[in-house]
Amino acid sequence: MDRKSSGGCSIMFKSGFIGIIGRPNVGKSTLLNGILGEKLAIITHKPQTTRNRIMGIRNADNAQFIFVDTPGIHSASTPLNRLMVRTATETFTDSDILLLVVEAGQAVHPEDLPIIESLKESGTISFLILNKIDLIRKEQLLPLMDAYRNLHSFAELIPISALTGEGIPLLLDELWKYLPEGPQYFPDDMMTDQSERFLAAEIIREKILLLTHKEIPYSSAVVVDAFKEDEARNLIRISATINVEKESQKGIIIGKKGTMLKEIGTRARVDMEKFFATRIFLELFVRVRKDWTKDPRMLREFGYNE
């Protein structure tokens, strides 16, 4: 696939899908945000924050990098968790390149081993991304790289800090070398294929993850019921429902005299106004949907498709 330069010469154009995979909490979503230069995927300190595949598009003069952030691969016990893991593993065959993200400060983690075996079986070009190098001494890095190199013939091993951005320019340069020639799949001004409703729901869910504890974050699903733009008033009106599994969880989400729900809404509104670059009117409701994480019908209703 060629493009014409201003001088009339053909310039090779490359494009491809790049899956970001790994265990929970290794920095996959932080990496996606760092690559895009904007916060698209929600980030918390809790494992299993990401539930859906999130596509982020990075354009260059001669390439389009289409990154796919995935849920962390883990031992799944509920239908929701099994769907999350399946969403991640489908990326093995849907991608042109796979980025296995691991923590640079640790020895080879036992849970990385089955992921590496799946990489081998897929035959997909794969990079090892050693994240969080800002937290370790440099002399710790080479032995860990050698250990992973002995497990699989990765095309490239690249140390990075997704948080500080160190190593991301090198990663993009190396990815370009392996991208296939192809068309521009998405327009220049498109950063993701996700809807505004989905992104608003994710911002709300991030605040629930950050402000609540124990089972509450994992028992909550956010559905945006209304998303209406009022251009005359430079305003978006959003109405959303937080679905939980038990009455006791509903009480915690609402909080004493509604204080927790108000805090969730305030923090979400501030982030939405930054992301959508306009004023936001946000109203939140809380509803009990008993055992929704185990009910295939409700999982589909909340966007977690089987």
UniProtKB/Swiss-Prot annotation:
Sequence segments annotated as region (G5): 160-162
Sequence similarity: Belongs to the TRAFAC class TrmE-Era-EngA-EngB-Septin-like GTPase superfamily. Era GTPase family.
Protein name: GTPase Era
Region G1: start-end pairs: 22-29
Gene Ontology molecular-function annotations: GTP binding; GTPase activity; ribosomal small subunit binding; small ribosomal subunit rRNA binding
Domain named KH type-2: residues: 212-290
Annotated membrane topology: Peripheral membrane protein
Domain Era-type G, residue spans: 14-181
Annotated region (G4), positions in chain: 131-134
GO cellular component, one term: cytosol
Residues involved in GTP binding: 22-29, 69-73, 131-134
